[in-house]
Amino acid sequence: MKFKDLRDFIDYLEQEGQLKRIKQPIDPNQEITEICDRTLRAGGPALLFENPIGYDIPILANLFGTPERVAMGMGRQDVKELREVGKLLAYLKEPEPPRGFRDAMDKLPVFKQVFNMPTKRLRKAPCQQVIWQGDDVDLDKIPVMSCWPDDVAPLLTWGLTITKGPNKPRQNLGIYRQQKIAKNKVIMRWLAHRGGALDLRDWMDTHPGEPFPISVAFGADPATILGAVTPVPDTLSEYAFAGLLRGSKTEVVKSLSNDLDIPASAEIVLEGYIDPNEFADEGPYGDHTGYYNEVERHHVFTITHVTMREDPIYHSTYTGRPPDEPAVLGVALNEVFVPILQKQFPEIVDFYLPPEGCSYRMAVVTMKKQYPGHAKRVMMGVWSFLRQFMYTKFVIVLDDDVNARDWNSVIQAMTTRMDPVRDTLLIESTPIDSLDFASPVVGLGSKMGLDATVKWEAETASTPSGTSQAAPDFDIETGTRNLLMQFPEIVDFYLPQEADKNSMAIVSIKKDAAGHATRVMDGVWSFLSQFTDAKFVIVCDDDVNVRDWNDVIWAITTRMDPSRDTLLIANAPIDSLDLTSPVVGLGSKMGLDATNKWQGETAREWGRPITKDPEIVAKVDAIWNELGILD
């Protein structure tokens, strides 16, 4: 499937029943977010809002709201085919010459695609049919969405930001959110390791004090959009990769105010510059973590020109607690990552970024273990091989007989193959996403690796004694009632069936003080010691459903700094038949404090969870059936 532009893709999706036109007037202030959130959670279609209230420009949203539509945008029929995209990227990252005639013939399709990598520059392009410049530049005429009740201002979300470093031969395309602060100004929020930020830093070194040129394109063709979110090698332009995906050269045109190439088929383009000395406070915004982020200082992007198609379409999205559109993109791009990792680490069988872990904060890896300590090498490889994973806080490594995408399978392996102290790797003072308020310092926190593989002889000296005493029968309902009498702050108590011999407990509490979670852990261990040896206890707040792994993993990845919030107890009594313990009958325990932190537990301002406006919810309730989105 080849899509020349966004409209070509829209037509295709509509023919396939994958796009719904919304003709009713809908407010871009939170109403579109509410409608898209319901649609995405139901696996529904892309949405084209033809009459956003107050504007004459339609809004396209939920475009990549299912992994299948991401695959379609990459020219594939099925999500599984995205592994082929990953294999292509793995080859481009480390190309190898043919090892003979047969290998050359096998690689011929790849070699042919190389002809689609150069861009095709046009003299005229649809994206420059309409031009605003000077005083005519007015972002208020574009239907920029406000997504959540406490968002500080409207937010531009799907723009492809085009930059070029002074010492680099290629342009960089990246997607960074932009807060509207004036008719001609937005705040450019990009992380320090991202391509645009690196280009700006190089520019400031070589052109101190001079304005840094930028162009931002909205509504490019799907291959170019997805090329900007795919982990292409640093030496490869996103435009070149889009040409490979599409099977034809990416058409570009020179910006009016600078030398940057922009997608010729884009719907709307913003051109301008960053003054290296101009900053503004960005945020707070409801983010993909499910919380409002902290206010941070970022550079201001001043817009000198706006160009667009006649009758343009504005492409937008929202971010919120998973699942959201970025989480869905993460699920699809997960398939691209696997072959890239396998080329460097062929022992890896599967690699999974669970969307409930905010797409990148947790990775689950299965492998063919080949020697003692192998799991820790894989952990280090995940954290260091691709910069996309430098902010991943938790890595769980398992054998290849475990299903990395099934929490029941993962938890069973953790409870039967781990001694928590021996098999946990904690690394402090590592790079962390600045949006992660759980870290002790902005941009700096800890990482945790869990080795849930079967241990080799050199990794454990334990041998079974065969003398374990049977624990008394444990009636869960009676036990839970007794526990709640001792700890009335406990809201729910759950022993997952997939955890071996009740060796994991998950508890939700009404937290009322710093250190409360640790006290509950101690109480749960003391109570359960009458019946079973619980190696793992997880404590969450009462807004978490402890019987839903999506909720629990979300709490762990958003509310924990691994080093600060993990309690490890060595030399604890363990079932003598537990072969994972270092000493017969003596092992270790792990407690995870996945609660919101109080003053005294963190020095940072804690995130506020996103909550919807009840009036907006009620308004959408009233028109939901009329919209007919899921019919």
Curated annotation (Swiss-Prot):
Q: State which pathway it belongs to.
A: Cofactor biosynthesis; ubiquinone biosynthesis
- Pfam assignment, any one: UbiD_N
Keyword set, alphabetical order: Cell membrane, Decarboxylase, Lyase, Membrane, Ubiquinone biosynthesis
Q: Which Gene3D superfamilies match?
A: Single helix bin (1.20.5.570), UbiD C-terminal domain-like (3.40.1670.10)
- What is the first-listed, main subcellular location in coarse terms? membrane
Q: What is a single molecular function from GO for this protein?
A: 3-octaprenyl-4-hydroxybenzoate carboxy-lyase activity
What membrane topology is annotated for this entry? Peripheral membrane protein
Q: What does this protein do?
A: Catalyzes the decarboxylation of 3-octaprenyl-4-hydroxy benzoate to 2-octaprenylphenol.
Family from the record: Belongs to the UbiD family.
Note the subunit structure. Homohexamer.
Name this polypeptide is given: 3-octaprenyl-4-hydroxybenzoate carboxy-lyase
- Protein source organism: Photobacterium profundum (strain SS9)
Q: Which gene encodes it?
A: ubiD
